[in-house]
Curated annotation (Swiss-Prot):
Gene it is expressed from: ureD
GO molecular function: nickel cation binding
Family the entry assigns: Belongs to the UreD family.
Role, per record: Required for maturation of urease via the functional incorporation of the urease nickel metallocenter.
GO cellular component terms given for this protein: cytoplasm
Database matches in InterPro entries: UreD
Protein's name in the database: Urease accessory protein UreD
Localisation: Cytoplasm
Source species of the chain: Bacillus cereus (strain ATCC 10987 / NRS 248)
Record flagged with keyword Cytoplasm: yes
């Protein structure tokens, strides 16, 4: 495998009711802020930055995060990630997350924007314990096109595997390939252009909680939203929308609901703009 275009490793632990870094390493195009503490729960907030401006042909990014026992961390990006044209190749990102006993990890980056002739692959592996918590979102949107076409990218290929006590509990593979089939058709994006996934794994998730979440959404007229439970205590939400703002509104509503009803915490503002 070629040398990474950017590397980011974060290792945190709980110390005196506060999450603190043990080791943080970043190299080349990937950078990260110092931990920021925005709430009263000792959670460490990190903002990932890409100094390269966007992903290009042959780029390879590696992000590895370890959340120790009882630690809490929230990780997001500074802004949307842009993937530009990748002729005869693709950009690759690999994510490996390790969540310890009674630990909580929230990974909610801004959307991935796919421009004309872009090809992108993402591989995500997450290793959890029975009483750890995961809140994860992933979203993809088309980039601006001079002729107003929605899908001018080559493909978006994202594979997520979640392991609970070393047992595979979630296998989620999304492949959007507008060069081979129309994404507007029923059963794929159905005339929508923006796609989002929100995954929650937490021991407090029940069928009643999922039912309550379904009825809590507001301003959903221009979207399609589906919720399914996982084989472990958790659920997956799919969102189809026409714009980023509507999709992120649902992400925020889901995030706030999970914080309040699963973690029994308030959701603190983490405004970036």
């Amino acid at each position: 495998m070629k040398s990474p275009t950017g590397v980011l490793n974060i290792d945190v632990m709980e110390k005196r009711d506060k999450t603190v870094p043990i080791k943080v390493y970043h190299k080349d195009a990937l950078k990260v802020t110092q931990p920021i503490y925005l709430d009263k729960y000792g959670r460490a907030y990190y903002y990932i930055m890409n100094s390269g401006g966007g992903y290009l042909k042959g780029d390879f990014y590696s992000i590895n995060i370890n959340v120790g026992k009882d630690a809490k961390t929230y990780i997001t990006s500074q802004s949307a990630t842009k993937v530009y044209k990748t002729p005869n190749s693709y950009a690759l990102q690999e994510l490996n997350f390790y969540i310890g006993q009674n630990a909580a990890m929230e990974y909610l980056p801004d959307p991935l924007i796919m421009y004309k002739d872009a090809a992108y692959k993402q591989k995500t592996n997450i290793y959890m314990q029975n009483n750890s918590t995961l809140i994860l979102c992933d979203s993809v949107t088309p980039g601006w096109s001079p002729n107003m076409e929605k899908f001018t990218y080559q493909y978006f290929d994202s594979l997520t595997k979640i392991y609970m006590e070393n047992k595979l509990v979630v296998y989620d593979h999304l492949l959007l390939n507008p060069f081979k089939e129309s994404l507007d058709q029923m059963g794929i994006l159905n005339q929508y252009s923006h796609y989002g996934t929100f995954i929650v794994i937490n021991e407090n998730v029940t069928n009643d909680l999922i039912a309550a979440l379904k009825t809590s959404f507001s301003n959903t007229n221009n979207m399609k939203i589906g919720i399914a439970s996982t084989t472990c205590k958790g659920f997956v939400i799919r969102i189809l929308s026409h714009n980023t703002e509507d999709m992120e509104s649902i992400f925020f509503q889901c995030h706030r609901f999970v914080r309040e009803n699963c973690l029994h915490e308030e959701l603190t503002s983490y405004r970036k703009y």
